Design a protein with these regions (language model features):
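Bacterial N-terminal signal peptides
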Residues: 5-16
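Non-catalytic, glycine-rich low-complexity segments
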Residues: 21-59, 64-67, 103-109, 115, ...
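Aromatic- and carboxylate-lined catalytic core of secreted/periplasmic carbohydrate-active enzymes
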Residues: 22-25, 44-45, 131, 350-353, ...
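Aromatic sugar-binding surface patches on proteins
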Residues: 34, 69-77, 502-508
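Extended acidic/polar, glycine-enriched regions
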Residues: 54, 60-122
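Extracellular glycoside hydrolase catalytic/binding regions
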Residues: 247, 268-406
Length: 531
């Protein structure tokens, strides 16, 4: 009879296993497989219970930590990077959670599932399946702490925007234009300062899960800011002890690391968190990198003092520096210094608030995006227009009011048409306005200059195996207006001849006519025999 009962249990619940262990039966490659188990709710499940599981397929084996999700439910999340049949077995100090086994099937990815974003070609990014990722991010620091209706409006706005990354905070923010209390808090307790940091509020983190997944549906990366200084003791989340920090970070990573669109930002303006020292950030960075078994991108954002961006656990440099992207040459220097992708996540914001960091023009912000791009780096957007209801995009989200987003959509289309490997400086020591892929694709950004013509000339193309001699290379040209969002083809083609030690020009010595306006870009592409 007992055998018959077990057989019925297996048939009825497959692939939900006996003992009420539930597992996602089928998941896409780079999707999220979730295992749910019932367990003890007495005492403090967050600290008393240890739970992990080993997931394996063939010779591949990955161990992840589980977490308590409230109401007697424990979860383990896993992001499979291989297709096939995966199995798991749990390990716990609680007998009812220990040695639980199961399996699930991983299928091919569909739709906009290209996997997590990784570093590619030293200075650039690509999804795990090799699809290029050209970062065009924006910032809504605490959109996730606003009323549900406003959160929905933010997602609606993002869906119709050019942005493919959103920076936002786990913890709420206390700052000018952002003084409302959130509806949920990360810990059990009583606001504003009475918290039991040993007990998390699962509802807070369940909502965070949902925010990440909503962005994933839109194809937007979630650049999650784990710590920030915009508290100043109001809640005290910026002044937790190292033990409290570590416990919180482990919990967040165990919950979110299995979502493919997650990026980690250890802190925003880390150096403004005066309670922490450099060794604290080293510990925090090493901890997050070690706890994340899926190796998501990881960065730390600066205020006035740059962090040591050469640290091996930092995958890319997240930089605040508006002047660095006023021209391409300055932006490019950061690449040489750190030898990894550079994302200028904060270059000041389009807006009109009475703060110098939040009142640059749309023209200036768009210019900085282009200058950063030509420097072989990436730039982030923000918007701070005053509003009677204190809903500013940079903090609370809502709707975009500025003039830069349509121009950034134009840039997005240009980037989508650019070389998959990324845009790199071509003549950085002398003519930093040239970028692209030498001998194949060029963007020459003239910035704030207002020329009426441009002599066709290209820095010496490389003489590599598979490339024709320079004198046999032919190119087409277009004039792009970065502000007016126009593309004007230039008539005819251009065949190279040597001008001097550094440049090749057109055999006919032609010049390209320009409108005498700023923000002009000349796009040049080599003509192939198959074209």
């Amino acid at each position: 009879m007992r055998f018959l009962f077990l057989l019925c249990c297996w048939v009825i619940s497959f692939p939900t296993y006996c003992g009420a262990v539930e597992v996602t039966p089928q998941v896409e490659q780079w999707g999220t497989a979730e295992v749910s188990l019932p367990g003890p709710s007495k005492g403090n499940p967050f600290s008393d219970v240890l739970l992990s599981a080993k997931f394996y397929e063939g010779e591949t084996s990955i161990e992840v930590d589980g977490f308590y999700d409230g109401d007697g439910v424990y979860r383990l999340r896993f992001m499979p990077e291989k297709q096939g049949k995966w199995r798991f077995v749990t390990k716990s100090n609680v007998p009812e959670l220990d040695a639980q086994e199961g399996e699930f099937t991983v299928t091919a990815p569909t739709g906009n599932n290209h996997g997590p974003v990784r570093v590619a070609n030293t200075f650039h990014f690509a999804y795990a399946d090799g699809t290029p990722y050209k970062q065009l991010g924006t910032t809504c620091y605490v959109w996730n702490h606003q009323p549900a209706e406003l959160q929905a409006k933010t997602l609606e706005t993002l869906a119709d925007s050019p942005f493919n990354k959103l920076r936002f905070c786990v913890f709420p923010k206390r700052y000018k234009w952002n003084e409302n209390e959130p509806e949920l808090y990360p810990f059990e307790g009583k606001p504003p300062r009475t918290w039991n940091t040993e007990r998390f509020d699962p509802k807070f983190f369940q909502h965070l899960d949902q925010c990440v997944l909503e962005l994933q549906k839109l194809g937007i990366e979630a650049d999650i800011i784990l710590l920030h200084p915009y508290d100043e003791g109001h809640w005290g989340f910026d002044r937790m002890t190292p033990v409290e920090d570590d416990r919180y970070l482990k919990y967040v990573v165990s919950r979110l690391a299995a979502y493919r669109n997650v990026w980690w930002s250890l802190a925003n303006e880390y150096d403004f968190m005066t309670e922490k020292r450099e060794e604290d950030w080293e510990r925090i960075g090493e901890l997050v990198a070690a706890e994340d078994r899926f190796e998501h991108l990881l960065s730390i954002h600066n205020g006035k003092r740059l962090f040591n961006q050469t640290r091996p656990w930092l995958t890319h440099a997240s930089i605040q520096n508006g002047s660095a992207v006023e021209d391409p040459a300055r932006a490019e220097l950061f690449r040489d210094a750190f030898r990894k992708p550079i994302v200028f996540d904060e270059v000041k914001y389009e807006g009109n608030i009475p703060k110098r960091w939040g009142n640059i023009s749309a023209e200036e912000l768009v210019h900085r995006f282009w200058a950063g791009t030509i420097g072989g780096t990436y730039v982030g957007h923000g918007e701070t227009y005053l509003s009677p209801d204190d809903i500013l995009w940079w903090s609370k989200g809502g709707v975009l009011k500025g003039e830069s987003p349509p121009r950034l959509e134009f840039l997005r289309k240009v980037l989508a048409d650019s070389p998959a490997e990324g845009i790199d400086p071509i003549d950085k020591w002398q003519n930093p306005e040239y970028a692209g892929k030498s001998a194949e694709y060029y963007l020459i950004y003239l910035g704030k200059e207002k020329p009426t013509e441009w002599l066709f000339k290209l820095p010496n193309p490389p003489q590599l195996v598979g490339l024709p001699p320079a004198e046999k290379m032919t190119f087409t040209a277009e004039v792009l207006d970065a502000w007016n969002m126009t593309v004007t083809p230039v008539e005819g083609t251009f065949t190279l001849k040597k001008l001097d030690d550094y440049f090749y020009g057109d055999t006919k010595g032609r010049k390209i006519k320009l409108p005498g306006k700023p923000y002009q870009v000349i796009r040049i592409k080599r003509v192939h025999d198959s074209d």
